[in-house]
From Swiss-Prot:
EC numbers on record: 6.3.5.7
UniProt keyword terms in alphabetical order: ATP-binding, Ligase, Nucleotide-binding, Protein biosynthesis
A GO CC term attached to the entry: glutamyl-tRNA(Gln) amidotransferase complex
Function: Allows the formation of correctly charged Gln-tRNA(Gln) through the transamidation of misacylated Glu-tRNA(Gln) in organisms which lack glutaminyl-tRNA synthetase. The reaction takes place in the presence of glutamine and ATP through an activated gamma-phospho-Glu-tRNA(Gln).
Pfam families: Amidase (PF01425)
Cited InterPro entries: Amidase (IPR000120), Amidase_CS (IPR020556), Amidase_dom (IPR023631), AS_sf (IPR036928), GatA (IPR004412)
Naturally occurring in which organism (per UniProt): Burkholderia lata (strain ATCC 17760 / DSM 23089 / LMG 22485 / NCIMB 9086 / R18194 / 383)
Subunit structure: Heterotrimer of A, B and C subunits.
Catalytic activity: L-glutamyl-tRNA(Gln) + L-glutamine + ATP + H2O = L-glutaminyl-tRNA(Gln) + L-glutamate + ADP + phosphate + H(+)
Family the entry assigns: Belongs to the amidase family. GatA subfamily.
Name listed for the protein in its UniProt record: Glutamyl-tRNA(Gln) amidotransferase subunit A
Domain of life according to the entry: Bacteria
Gene Ontology terms for molecular function: ATP binding; glutaminyl-tRNA synthase (glutamine-hydrolyzing) activity
Length: 496
């Protein structure tokens, strides 16, 4: 039962093959048995089972919806009433929110059962989930490897089938890269599509929540509940509600032959995504996935995103600048860590922040404060914003000749735990293919498409699919067609 997708579990509940309480108990036992993965940081069986009982009561009355009774885990960046909400930081180690994030509230209103809070890089700053105050997360496929970050706890939980689905956030690739490393499906919606209210902020102009699950169809179900305008979030976009499942299983164009369901689909391949730095085994796996798309009727079209290499310096100016402002609120006064020994108030601020924040967070706060300081704002921050606009324009130019863009989600498979901790630049380079999508505010997703080679044969590879603004339903259709023709998304780590 634990290996079933959300769609399959939904059918099992409808057929009364199991109850919501039985499902919750099953996953809680699995979470306890897999504590060595360190995927979860907060679990409360009483809260979970109370939600499951309420879901069973709804189902018994025939009042349940598409997600009623289905379990989900939440990245610990979403504040959740009744649970600790820490953002992976010592600074918020004992914080309990008096309210639910909009994402959490909407999924609970849809009847979903919260299994717990998943581990993450501190304040979502990291690409490996080694920056957490609660310790590193292990990749279920190879426990010597990282699960990706910053949503590494969520990706590991779904991969190990400790939860059928999880929420994540993506600022520069933090849903797509861990989804790739852990062999699960994850989607970052268009910026503003999903409310950021109650999501502990890293970089406000980039942060976006999204679902992680086994399949594109599962992600579509979740996005139906998560997306929508929220007046409490000033960056939330007013759009008519839509059904993200509406194109699943449908041909790209009416009248397509059943054997060529994607005939007419134009897939853009950026030259810059297939150059130096892309590992040979990842390239071979992506090439095989693209051949599968050709077999389904799609046409491959060369495109160019010439400013791709600038996305790293641009991101690491803009994101730290916004982080330095957002994290200024954590000073040990109202909540969070407070130093035990200090002199005056200013000394308390300094010591509380020095003790409460980890090394990577401190690094980014310092960088952000520097680029925003007098004399450097124009040279760095303003210039980065101008290049950000050029990057977005490059995508729009590319979309004139294609419907979606594809390439690797990461230049390599997951690396060994501890292997890049002393070299932050090498860690940052791992996000080269995801950063520009975030800077442009576009939707993007990662779909499992195979594994590495040799010593990396147990480490998954993800295919990144990028769509134009508000084109999530079509992206999910394209991903779903691939998953109907392959079984990479159904494969599980040994022992699972």
């Amino acid at each position: 039962m634990h290996a079933k997708s959300l769609t399959e579990l939904r059918a099992a509940l409808a057929a009364k093959e199991c109850s919501a309480v039985e499902l919750a108990q099953l996953y809680l036992k699995r979470i306890e048995a897999a504590r060595d993965l360190n995927a979860f940081v907060h679990v409360d069986a009483d809260l979970t089972l109370a939600q499951a009982k309420a879901a069973d009561a709804e189902l018994a009355r025939g009042a349940g919806g598409a997600l009623t009774g289905l379990p989900i885990a939440h990245k610990d960046v979403f504040v959740t009433r009744g649970w600790h909400s820490t953002a992976g930081s010592k600074m918020l180690a004992n914080y309990e929110s008096p309210f639910d994030a909009t994402v959490v509230a909407r999924l609970q209103a849809a009847g979903m059962v919260t299994l717990g809070k998943t581990n993450m890089d501190e304040f979502a700053m990291g690409s490996s989930n080694e920056n957490s105050a609660f310790g590193a997360v292990k990749n279920p496929w190879d426990t010597n490897a990282v699960p990706g970050g910053s949503s590494g706890g969520s990706s590991a939980a779904v991969a190990a089938r400790l939860a059928p689905a999880a929420t994540g956030t993506d600022t520069g690739g933090s849903i797509r890269q861990p989804a790739s490393f852990a062999g699960v499906t994850g989607i970052k919606p268009t910026y503003g599509r999903v409310s950021r209210y109650g999501m502990i902020a890293f970089a406000s102009s980039l942060d976006q929540g999204g679902p992680m699950a086994q399949s594109a169809s599962d992600c579509a179900l979740l996005l139906n509940a998560m997306a929508g305008f929220d007046e409490r979030d000033s960056t939330s976009l007013e759009r008519e509600d839509e059904d993200f499942t509406r194109h699943l299983g449908q041909p790209w164009a009416a009248g397509n032959d059943a054997g060529k369901p994607l005939a007419g689909l134009r897939i853009g391949l950026p030259n810059e995504y297939f150059g130096d730095g892309l590992a040979d085994d990842v390239r071979a796996t992506i090439d095989a996935a693209l051949k599968q798309y050709e077999a389904l009727g799609a046409t491959l079209v060369p495109v160019s995103l010439p400013k791709t290499e600038l996305s790293i310096p641009v991101y690491y100016v803009i994101a730290p600048a916004e982080a330095s402002s957002n994290l200024s609120r954590f000073d040990g006064v109202r909540f969070g860590h407070r130093a035990a020994q200090y002199g005056d108030l200013l000394d308390m601020y300094k010591k509380s922040r020095a003790e409460g924040f980890g090394p990577e967070v401190k690094r980014r706060i310092l960088v952000g404060a520097y680029v925003l300081s007098h004399g450097y704002y124009d040279a760095y921050y303003l210039q980065a914003q101008k290049i950000r606009r050029i990057i977005a324009n490059d995508f729009q130019e590319a979309f004139k000749s294609c419907d979606v863009i594809m390439g690797p989600a990461s230049p390599t498979v997951a690396w060994d735990l501890g292997s890049k901790g002393d070299d932050p630049v090498q860690m940052y380079l791992a996000d080269i293919y995801t950063l520009s999508v975030s800077l442009a505010g576009l939707p993007g997703m990662s779909v499992p498409c195979g594994f590495g080679a040799g010593a990396n044969a147990k480490r998954p590879v993800g295919l990144q699919i990028i769509g134009n603004y508000f084109n999530e339903a079509r992206m999910l259709q394209v991903a779903d067609a691939f998953q109907r023709a392959t079984d990479w998304h159904k494969q599980v780590p040994a022992g699972v």
